[in-house]
């Protein structure tokens, strides 16, 4: 107990940010825990699957507009947090690039929706979901993370999501209300983005400094490898739902998506840990390599312990969890949940080896190369088995790919003699 109190005392900022992000993730995952059982029953597997397919499609444009800034800009702001002029310069350059990328994405989006019948048949739904990307473009998560003031994200998200939950229960009543649900999701994202942007400007005394071409190119260069990494990650995460939707009925997409939502809800603590720890480990590394290694060793032990508890619980109790949370109509989700139950443990390890160790040590290129190979493996497996095995094939593909990523990160840091283990 004394040792634990000492660790907390020596890492007050980290503990404070981790607590804020844990509460934020709790709020984020209470949201689906409250609404998921209601929505899967009201919408049914088909419409619920369609909504998730549309969300997976929109996620491609989120990847384009984010451009890896949630890591690269966070890292840069963390190092320069005491220089207000430099932080404003980074803020202005990154926001400008994200807005430009959004307009480029808009052109791509409208071309795809008008050219392919799969999308044009539900053009209204895809358009509504795409508008939500605006909110993600505007929300400067990388600023809050960089200055380690995550409690403000908590306040903004909880306030707006509370209104969203009430709106869903009041307005979404029947299967055909799926478009209304998409509108609610989009309004939530846009409101969060606008509120987060203006609050950050006022709270952190940010100024928009019209960026030069050199500054824009500098930010693009810094985020490039992480942008590629984001694309490769997306090809074996969000793309799984998208690929499944190309071959399977919407109802099958619903079975997989519902099981994955349950897994993500249980895995929520990882996002809190990753977001709060990343700027902290960068700061530690700037102070002392030994402190950096020592901290990541402790982080690894905690990750293994939490991962084993979460994954084994999901595997052992998959059937009652599906029955209680999703209902009898989603019985095919049980086997999916059992297969992907081990993802939390695997991803926890991957996070420590990759994001918290390789990226601070400037191994972005190798990080990106590993994820590129993972994306290729996932695509090969998916297009080989998903057409025949649908949701089971998607789950297997996801599991195999994540195992490959974690093992590759592990082998790399061992080869470089980085003593995290």
Put a short name on every predicted segment.
Residues 123, 127-130, 154-204, 373-377, ...:
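Hydrophobic alpha-helical transmembrane segments
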Residues 66-82, 263-288, 354-360:
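Helix-loop junctions and terminal segments of transmembrane helices
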């Amino acid at each position: 107990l004394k040792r634990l109190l000492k660790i907390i005392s020596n890492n007050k900022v980290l503990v404070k940010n981790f607590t804020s992000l844990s509460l934020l993730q709790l709020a984020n995952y209470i949201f689906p825990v409250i609404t998921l059982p209601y929505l899967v029953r009201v919408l049914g597997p088909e419409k619920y699957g369609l909504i998730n397919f549309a969300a997976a499609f929109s996620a491609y444009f989120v990847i384009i507009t984010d451009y890896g800034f949630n890591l690269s800009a966070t890292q840069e702001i963390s190092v320069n947090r005491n220089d207000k002029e430099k932080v404003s310069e980074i803020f202005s350059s990154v926001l400008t690039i994200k807005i430009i990328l959004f307009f480029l994405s808009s052109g791509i989006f409208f071309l795809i929706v008008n050219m392919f019948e799969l999308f044009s048949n539900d053009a209204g739904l895809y358009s509504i979901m795409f508008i939500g990307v605006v909110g993600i473009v505007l929300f400067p998560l990388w600023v809050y993370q960089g200055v380690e003031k995550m409690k403000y994200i908590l306040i903004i998200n909880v306030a707006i999501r509370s209104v969203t939950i009430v709106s869903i229960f009041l307005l979404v009543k029947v299967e055909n209300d799926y478009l209304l649900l998409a509108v609610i999701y989009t309004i939530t994202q846009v409101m969060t983005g606008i509120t987060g942007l203006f609050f950050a400007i006022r709270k952190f005394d940010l100024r928009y400094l019209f960026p030069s071409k050199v500054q824009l190119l500098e930010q693009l260069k810094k985020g490039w490898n992480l942008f590629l990494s984001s694309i490769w990650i997306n090809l074996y995460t969000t793309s799984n739902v998208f690929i499944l939707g190309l071959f399977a009925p919407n109802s099958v997409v619903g079975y997989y998506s519902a099981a994955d939502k349950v897994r993500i809800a249980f895995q929520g603590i990882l996002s809190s840990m990753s977001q709060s720890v990343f700027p902290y480990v960068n700061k530690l590394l700037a102070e002392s390599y030994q402190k950096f290694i020592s901290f990541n060793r402790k982080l690894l032990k905690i990750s293994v312990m939490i991962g084993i508890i979460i994954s084994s619980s999901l595997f052992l109790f998959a059937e009652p969890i599906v029955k209680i949370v999703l209902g009898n109509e989603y019985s095919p989700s049980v086997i999916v949940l059992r297969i992907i139950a081990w993802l939390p443990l695997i991803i926890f390890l991957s996070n420590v080896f990759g994001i918290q160790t390789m990226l601070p040590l400037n191994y972005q290129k190798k990080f990106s190369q590993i994820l590129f190979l993972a994306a290729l493996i996932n695509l090969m497996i998916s297009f080989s088995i998903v057409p025949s095995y649908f949701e089971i094939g998607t789950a297997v593909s996801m599991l195999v790919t994540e195992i490959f990523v974690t093992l590759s990160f592990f082998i790399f840091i061992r080869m470089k003699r980085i003593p995290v283990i």
